Amino acid sequence: EVLLARGPADALALNRRYHDAATHARYAPQGDMARELYEAMETARCEAMGARDMPGTAGNIDVKIKHEALRRGYDQAKQASDVPLSVAAGYMVRHMATGRPLPAGAENAMELWRGFIEDQAGGTLEGIDGSLADQADFARLARKMISDLGYGDQLGDDPDSQDDEQEDQAEEGSEEEQDPDSTGQDDQDEEEAEGTQRLSQE
């Protein structure tokens, strides 16, 4: 019971340590299924970071995962439809990021979806280890994986593309300020030249 109580407490502490709400919101998908996948993967990232940096938390998180998996009946699941894809994806991210075996119920849930996930997003999953410590980089990977799994239409606009557009607009605005319309100056120069010519003729 002590370990069971420590698991959720550690999970909350790891979320506070490794999770930035603004970054999370920035890359969050719009659709329900895509968002569930995104949330599950980010939770797994935080827990995996904790397991790496503070190994003592790993066992407590394992107990939490085991309890949740058994409570939801994942140990008795017989087919993929018995387990939400988002849950299995989160388990797989944690397993691949830490190398730790999952508790039995969670292991069963992951294995039911493993073939599908690896077939659709195996190449993207290979980048997990390198992006784990950078939440924004991991969020981009998560969005790519969501697209791989067939939910790209639920992602919404790419926040990085929006930033590029804003930067381009800012640069254009800056160039216009630095290079103002010279028509007015040209007209003034012409008028001054004409005036000088009239004076010389007089």
What are these regions (language model features)?
Residues 1-202:
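Short, functionally important secondary-structure microenvironments
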